[in-house]
Structure formats: structure tokens, C-alpha cells
From Swiss-Prot:
Signal peptide: none annotated. GO terms for molecular function: aminoacyl-tRNA deacylase activity; ATP binding; isoleucine-tRNA ligase activity; tRNA binding; zinc ion binding. Pfam families: Anticodon_1 (PF08264), tRNA-synt_1 (PF00133), zf-FPG_IleRS (PF06827). Monomer. Its main location: cytoplasm. Binds 1 zinc ion per subunit. This is Isoleucine--tRNA ligase.
């Protein structure tokens, strides 16, 4: 038997079955870096049309997690697929470097700026820390197989970038969008600074829920508004609030002008509440006996006076549209210093804007009753005062969603402070942004409604911060008028030049007289820094417009769904404020990473999946396959079990590639490829199937439908290849003569297929695709990533794909019949069987034209096709209209091909072989036409 084994063309390859990705991937990464593969990709696409995916900068703090991996791998898939499509698709990664998280980490080591360390030294430590974090994250991103200009990234703390932030501010000032104001802003007491909306998280919090009586100064003027002319007695407008600490700042009670309000007679006093809320309000107050004495619109009470519940001052009734009847009383406590709606109402009625709370969250010393008390602890004291004055109508605790600082996880407050704002309406910026939103392609399309809603409802953007580590606002304001210096734009450019040379310390170290001369004594130098969302938001200016390898606007921005209120928003706002257009053509959004049950990943919950552990255990390509396998438009689940399933899918893909490579061990494409006209029909079918599939895959890449690519490739490996083509060609590949047309036809097809297949994989399974590419025979390019989509297909005559689809279906039915026969113990392998297929007039010609090669379709020792009319009685008809009869072969088994044939032993020189094998090991080359 051994001598016949040596006559077979058994597969052989150096491409290992075991991937060992955690070992091979770092070696390949080092090889890419040593060869400068990214630079060579760029060189190969010089002069091609550009495609710009602009990277949203991750924060330079801490190791990467699975959300980072999801984002960067998705971007990498896009960049690589666009490169294969012929685009020059550079990828310039970025990092966001200023701001509080870095300050906090540095504070842990050296203390607060200005106490144990000077602000200048503190900023140097922040810069040093951010640089160290970039080094860590750069290595971790590269380990994921993400190609890019990693050693020329954009970094928001680079001097030239900081200078451009300042210049961007100048452009927005020039266009009339900056204004200063004393307005309520999100304020974190722990940070001691204003917060951007994107820095606010909403979490559940237990708060007091109280109703407070505001008594009418002159009940008669209220009662006269009701047609019933009720008798005069005390009258109360009750308010409901969950922030009792804001009551010292109350300046009005707000009603809705068009809501119907009811006059409730409760015996000793009247109450005016929204008609829709009467029942719930009276129940809350424990008042069961009452009557309604009249109705009136809210607008009729405008300017009437009420008594503040614990101060001597009187406050007016005012009107506004934000009042609802969803909860409360329909009468809204209004403190202009502590809320954006309250502030706007206050502005329209010129209410006093008095802020009783200091930056540290404590009431100022001049605040009657509550001086020095922290607002976070003041509620109990305020409730006691209200109760003592008999104005506390109801009190309970509720659990509700409340804004918290994203970093400290502590409840934040609204606090009126002097700040700088990008006005949304001063120069019609809001409408201009909305107009630009309509021009952008939003994927998924709900992104458009989401960001539109945010823009329509957002207040002015507070861009000033009271922090040490950030880009300064290089402004001078007049000490008396508080107006900006008349030469502000010129001064900003001079400061930008200084920062470009020496960094942000150039401003903080600057003596005002250096720029203003004698004028300096009349001006205050602003010490605020800018919101970090402005830092990253102007990357379209500092990066896209200042890097010659990039273009503005970008083709794509691609980030998580939280960036509709973050980077998408700040980028859009600044771009429109600076030059009137959106910075992107398409915005893609992916969901959050969650566990298998859709819950947020958390170390405390025990469902956290460590990225480094996944990569070290499974390899980056398994993680990349996980990314591609999910529909990123929704939340993306990850767990050890999900990764293991992807590892199983990976093995099927790898084994498909390995089979193709192993059967090309003696194939030289330069000399062994055969003419397309000589290809067997099955090989032509396989090539045509690949060409059609490639069109589908390219379309899916262009539409960013990566999960469809995963499904198509997996189906191709499992169905088209694994259970059909690769199974059928084994006999021909192994048993026919080495240089026969039949075998070289198969190898020619496999050569084209493995090259195309590997390029399909490359954007997703980058390391594995490169490994396959280096094993494919022939003179291939240095790296697969320099290639285009495969286009060296043989010119194939028309192949009837429907016929082969039908043959595939019949084969599946035959396999079922063979398995049933095997289960009954009548046969062992399929080669121990002979099959007769009885088919109708539609299917029969497709089978009979294969002639003797029909048995190779079923991988049985004998097969024939007959009209269905000849089918034995009782033989079941399958869904595809055929009947199948399986019998055990009575013939001897060929020692070489294992087929059981009547002619085994007829050749005396090779008594163990069938005549087909005798011919294949001698001068006779078996001829095949179809399979």
C-alpha cells in the first residue's frame, strides 16, 4: 500500500493548522513596522483619489478597553477596504490630552497646582503623564493590527495644535459667536469648574421632594381673575421641587400662559394649581374635602406678587412655555442662578440674577439663615426652616435621574458664574448648524434626529473652564466695562505664535504689559482654560486643514453613539461657527459594548472583559472577527463565550485557506496555470461563484455592512467550499496525474480563489490574511495591503449557475439518503455505496450530462440517473422532486482511490487497483470534463 500512497498528490503546506496568534501576530507586527508597510501603502496610492476617515481622539488616560478596540478596528476595516478599492486612505490617529482626568491622576502624585507644586510645574507633569499614556495606548492599538501614521499622530497638547485652538477661538470671535455672561452652568463642586454637557452623566439619586407655599401678597387681585368672585381669604400658589437648596435664590414663580389653572377652596385658604393636577396635589397634601371655585388661564396672573417662603422679599408671577402638567403643581419655582430655563425667564423679566452659592458649593457668608452651609447638606436645614414657618405643604424622598460629574460621579449643580460662551443664537449659529445637519449622511439614520434634537434644545455652549491643564483663553477684558480689548484678534494671533513656539505656558507666564504696554493697567488677563471638547472639536481645523495628506471636509467621522452630544456636536458647532460648513460628509455611529445579556460592562458586576487578556489568550484577529461579526449599529455584546464562538468561526476560515494552500504545494502560477477554455466546469463554477461573491463583499464594504461580510465569508467557507467544492475536488486533486489538465484545472481555480479570498479577509483578519498571502505560490507583492481587490480572474465562458445550484441541492439529498443507509448499518463510507437518482424531466438532463462523472458529484463508487417514472414503488420523493436509491457496492475496494469498482484486479501488474488508477500512475491521464 505504501507504494501507492507515494503516487498520490497529498496536500502539503507550511501554513500551520494551529494559528498561535498570540505568538505570530507580534512577530508580524514587528515585520510590518520594520518594512514600513504603512508608508509603502501610501506610496502605492500616490495620485489616487483620497478617502479621509478622521479619527476622533481617545483620551490619553489608562489602558484600552473593548470599546476602544471596537472603535479603532471598525475604522481600520474601513481604511483597509478603501485602500483595496484604490483610494489613497491615510489614517492619522489622534489623542485628546488636556482636562480633568489627567489633572486628577497627576494630583494623586504631586498634589494640587498652586499648593505643593507650582501651576507651571503641574502643567509639565500633566504633559509628561499624557505623553506616557499615549505611548501605552499607541502600542495597544497597534497590537490590534490597526495600521496608521502612529508616530505622526495629532495630539491636542502639541504646541502647534494648542496654537490652532487659540486661532480657532479667534475665528469664532471674528464671526461674532463669543459672548461673556453670568449664567447658570453645569458645575462640579469637586472639580471646582464648569462642565460641558458631554461631561455630565445621569444616574439615579435620592432627593427630597417637597411642596412649598408661596402666599399671595394681595389675594384679591388673584381672586378677581375668576368669574365666580369668591370670598377673600389667604391664597397659596404651591410649588414643587427636588432641589430645596435653590430656594434661597428664588426670584419668581412661573406659570404657563395657556394652561388652565383651578382655584381650589380648601376651607381656610385657597390654592391655585394646574387643573390637570388638582387631584394628585390635594392627595399629596392630605386634603380630602375641597371644592373647585373657578378656572383661569395662567396668563391672567402675570406680575402678581407672592411672598417668598422665608425671606422678606416679594417675588412676581411670570410666564413661560417650559411649564408642564406632567408632575408637580403647574407652578414652578424659579431661581435664575440655578437653571437654564430659570435664567432665560429671568432675562426676559429682568429678574435679579443673585447667586448665593460660592464655587466650593457653600452658601456665601451674606446668605441669611444658611451662610457657610454646603448645598449638598443644606436641604435638611432648609426643610426645618420651611416647617417652622408653616409653608412646607408636603415632603417625601424620591429616587430619580440626576446629573452627575462624569469623573467624580458626584451630583453636580447649576451655578451662575462668569463664563465665556459660544452663543447659539447671537449670529444665527443654531439655524446654520441645523441647515448643515440636513446635508450630512447619518448612519444609522436615527443619528440625524438625535443630533438635530440636541442642537435645537442646547443652551449656549460654555467653553471656559477654571482648570490648570488646558489651552488658555488668551483674552484681555477692560476692568471697568468688561469689554474685550479692541485689538483682540491681533492679540490672539500674537499669542498663538508664542504658544506654537513655547506651548501654553507662554500665555500663563506672560506679563500683560508685554502685549499691551501701558494699556495693561486697564485690562484684566483672563486665566480660564478652554473646554476640552473645543480642543478636540477643532481638529477639522488643526488637522484636516493643516495636514497636506488630508482633506476637508472628511469623508467619514465614526464614533460611539455618545458622541452625538460629544465630538460630533463640538466638531459641527465649531466648523459652522468658523467657516459655515459641516466638517464631515458621513457620520457613522456604533453602539456601546455590553455583556451577553445587554448589560453595561463593569468590574464590580463581574462581567468586565479585559482587552489585554482577550488579545493575549485568543489573538487580535479573533477580536477583529468579533467586531466584524456584529451589527455595530446596535449595542455590541461581548463575553468569553461570544469570543469562543468567533474562535470557532475563525478556525473554519483558517482551515479553508489551509486546504487551498496545501493543494498548491507544487503549483507555479507562471507555468502551471491552464487556459480558461480548458478549465473543468466545476472549476469554472467555483471561479464564477467567487467573482459574484466578491461583488457582494465589495458592496458590503462600501456600505459599511461588515456583519454581512462575515456571514458571506462564513457561508462561503462552510457551504460553497467545505461541503461542496473542496469535497468534490479531493479525488481529482489527489488521484489524477500530477501535471494532468484535470488537476492543473483545479489548482488554477484554487490559486485565483485563495488570492481573492485572502484579500476579502484582509480588512478584518489582517494578521491571518498577511500570513496566507506570504504562503501563496508565485511572485506576490511584499504585503497584501498594497493590493487592490482581485481582478486577475480568467475569462470564463458562461457557466449555468442555476444548473450547479440544482446539482448542489440533489447532492444534499443524496447525502441525507447515504447517512440514513449508514445509520442502518448497511454501508460504512459513501464510497461503499452505489446510488441511483430518479429525477423528473427538469432535473434529469442536468444529471445525465455528467455521465460517468456523476459518481464524483456524490462521492460514491457508482451513480446513475434515471427517469422518475422508473422509480421503484414505495421510494419516497424528496422536496426537490427526486427519489434516491442507495445500495451497498459488491465490488472490491481500490487500494489507491478507495472506490469500489468492477475493474479492480483486472490489471495483473497492479491487482489492487481499479483501471482508472492504473492509468493515472502510468502514461494515461484521466480525462474529466465536469468534476
Amino acid at each position: 500500500m505504501a507504494e501507492y500512497k507515494d503516487t498520490l498528490n497529498l496536500p502539503n503546506t507550511s501554513f500551520p493548522m494551529k494559528a498561535s496568534l498570540s505568538v505570530r501576530e507580534p512577530e508580524m507586527l514587528a515585520d510590518w513596522q520594520a518594512k514600513g508597510i504603512y508608508q509603502k501603502i501610501r506610496k502605492a496610492r500616490v495620485g489616487s483619489k483620497r478617502f479621509i476617515l478622521h479619527d476622533g481622539p481617545p483620551y490619553a488616560n489608562g489602558h484600552l478597553h473593548c470599546g476602544h478596540a471596537l472603535n479603532k478596528i471598525l475604522k481600520d476595516i474601513i481604511i483597509k477596504s478603501k485602500t483595496f478599492s484604490g483610494f489613497d486612505a491615510p489614517f492619522v490617529p489622534g489623542w485628546d490630552c488636556h482636562g480633568l482626568p489627567i489633572e486628577l491622576n497627576v494630583e494623586k502624585k504631586v498634589g494640587k497646582a498652586g499648593s505643593k507644586i507650582s501651576p507651571r510645574e503641574f502643567r509639565a507633569k500633566c504633559r509628561e503623564y499624557a505623553a506616557s499614556q499615549i505611548d501605552i495606548q499607541r502600542d495597544e492599538f497597534q497590537r490590534l493590527g490597526v495600521l496608521g501614521d502612529w508616530y505622526n499622530p495629532y495630539v491636542t497638547m502639541d504646541y502647534h495644535y494648542e496654537a490652532n485652538i487659540v486661532r480657532a477661538l479667534g475665528l469664532m470671535i471674528k464671526n461674532g459667536h463669543l459672548q461673556q455672561g453670568f449664567k447658570p452652568v453645569h458645575w462640579c463642586i469637586d472639580c471646582g469648574s464648569a462642565l460641558a454637557e458631554a461631561e455630565v452623566d445621569y444616574e439615579d439619586k435620592t432627593s427630597p421632594s417637597i411642596d412649598v407655599a408661596f402666599s399671595a401678597v394681595n389675594p384679591s387681585e388673584f381672586l378677581n381673575c375668576f368669574e365666580t368672585q369668591p370670598a377673600v381669604k389667604p391664597l397659596i400658589l404651591p410649588i414643587w421641587t427636588t432641589t430645596p437648596w435653590t430656594l434661597p435664590a428664588n426670584e419668581a414663580v412661573c406659570l404657563h400662559p395657556e394652561i388652565d389653572y383651578a382655584l381650589i377652596d380648601a376651607g381656610n385658604s385657597y390654592y391655585i394649581v394646574a387643573t390637570d393636577l388638582v387631584e394628585s396635589v390635594m392627595a399629596r397634601y392630605g386634603i380630602s374635602h375641597y371644592k373647585t371655585s373657578g378656572f383661569a388661564k395662567g396668563r391672567v396672573f402675570e406680575h402678581f406678587k407672592l411672598q417668598h417662603p422665608f425671606y422678606k422679599r416679594q417675588v412676581p408671577v411670570v410666564l413661560a412655555e417650559h411649564v408642564t402638567t406632567e408632575s408637580g403643581t403647574g407652578c414652578v419655582h424659579t431661581a435664575p442662578a440655578h437653571g437654564p430655563d430659570d435664567y432665560l425667564v429671568g432675562q426676559s423679566y429682568q429678574l435679579p440674577l443673585i447667586n448665593p452659592v460660592m464655587a466650593n458649593g457653600c452658601f456665601a457668608e451674606n446668605v441669611e439663615l444658611f451662610a457657610g452651609i454646603s448645598v449638598l447638606k443644606a436641604n435638611e436645614t432648609i426643610l426645618a426652616v420651611l416647617s417652622e414657618r408653616n409653608v412646607l405643604l408636603a415632603s417625601e424622598s424620591i429616587r430619580h435621574s440626576y446629573p452627575h460629574c462624569w469623573r467624580h460621579k458626584s451630583p453636580m449643580i447649576f451655578l451662575a458664574t462668569p463664563q465665556w460662551f459660544i452663543s447659539m443664537d447671537k449670529s444665527n449659529l443654531r439655524q446654520a448648524i441645523i441647515n448643515e445637519i440636513d446635508k450630512v449622511n447619518w448612519v444609522p439614520d436615527w443619528g440625524k434626529a438625535r443630533i438635530s434634537n440636541m442642537v435645537e434644545n442646547r443652551p449656549d455652549w460654555c467653553i471656559s473652564r477654571q482648570r490648570s491643564w488646558g489651552t488658555p483663553m488668551p483674552l484681555f477684558v477692560h476692568k471697568t466695562t468688561r469689554e474685550l480689548h479692541p485689538d483682540t484678534l491681533e492679540l490672539i494671533e500674537r499669542v498663538a505664535v508664542m504658544i506654537e513656539k513655547s506651548g501654553i505656558d507662554a500665555w500663563f507666564d506672560l506679563d500683560s504689559s508685554e502685549l499691551l504696554g501701558d494699556d495693561a493697567k486697564h485690562y484684566d488677563k483672563i486665566t480660564d482654560t478652554m473646554d476640552v471638547w473645543l480642543d478636540s472639536g477643532i481638529s477639522h481645523y488643526s488637522v484636516l486643514k493643516h495636514n497636506n495628506d488630508l482633506d476637508f471636509p472628511a469623508d467619514v467621522y465614526f464614533e460611539g453613539s455618545d458622541q452625538h452630544r460629544g465630538w460630533f456636536n463640538s466638531s459641527l458647532t465649531t466648523a459652522v461657527a468658523m467657516y459655515g460648513v459641516a466638517p464631515y460628509k458621513t457620520v457613522l455611529t456604533h453602539g456601546y459594548t455590553v455583556d451577553a445579556e445587554g448589560k453595561k460592562l463593569s468590574k464590580s458586576k463581574g462581567n468586565y472583559v479585559a482587552l489585554d487578556k482577550l488579545v493575549n489568550q485568543h489573538g487580535a484577529d479573533i477580536l477583529r472577527l468579533w467586531v466584524a461579526s456584529t451589527d455595530y449599529r446596535h449595542e455590541v455584546s461581548i463575553s468569553e463565550e461570544i469570543i469562543k464562538r468567533n474562535a470557532d468561526a475563525y478556525r473554519r476560515i483558517r482551515n479553508t485557506a489551509r486546504f487551498l494552500l496545501a493543494n498548491l504545494f507544487d503549483f507555479n502560477p507562471a507555468s502551471d496555470c491552464i487556459d480558461a477554455k480548458e478549465l473543468l466546469e466545476l472549476d469554472r463554477w467555483a471561479l464564477k461563484r467567487c467573482q459574484l461573491l466578491q461583488e457582494e463583499i465589495i458592496t458590503a464594504y462600501e456600505n459599511y455592512h461588515f456583519h454581512l461580510i462575515y456571514q458571506k465569508i462564513h457561508n462561503f467557507c462552510a457551504v460553497d467550499m467545505g461541503s461542496f467544492y473542496l469535497d468534490l475536488i479531493k479525488d481529482r486533486q489527489y488521484t489524477t496525474a500530477k501535471d494532468s489538465i484535470a488537476r492543473r484545472s483545479c489548482q488554477t481555480a484554487m490559486y485565483h480563489m485563495v488570492k481573492a479570498f485572502t484579500i476579502w479577509l484582509a480588512p478584518i483578519l489582517s494578521f491571518t490574511a498577511e500570513e496566507i498571502w506570504q504562503t501563496i505560490p508565485g511572485n506576490n507583492s511584499e504585503s497584501i495591503f498594497i493590493e487592490h481587490w482581485y481582478n486577475a480572474w480568467p475569462t470564463i465562458d458562461a457557466v449555468n449557475m442555476e444548473d450547479w445550484e440544482q446539482l448542489h441541492i440533489v447532492r444534499d439529498e443524496v447525502n441525507k439518503a447515504l447517512e440514513e443507509t449508514r445509520q442502518r448499518g448497511e454501508i460504512g463510507s459513501a464510497l461503499a455505496a452505489e446510488v441511483t437518482v430518479y429525477a423528473d424531466a427538469k432535473v434529469l438532463p442536468k444529471l445525465t450530462r455528467l455521465g460517468e462523472e456523476l459518481r464524483f458529484l456524490f462521492i460514491t463508487s457508482e451513480a446513475k440517473a434515471c427517469p422518475i417514472s422508473q422509480s421503484p414503488k414505495g421510494l419516497a420523493v424528496t422536496d426537490c422532486g427526486v427519489s434516491i436509491q442507495v445500495t451497498a457496492s459488491v465490488h472490491e475496494k481500490c487500494a489507491r482511490c478507495w472506490h469500489r469498482r468492477e475493474d479492480v484486479g483486472q490489471n495483473q501488474e497492479h491487482p489492487e487497483l481499479c483501471l482508472r488508477c492504473v492509468g493515472n500512475i502510468s502514461r494515461y491521464h484521466e480525462e474529466r470534463l465536469y468534476i
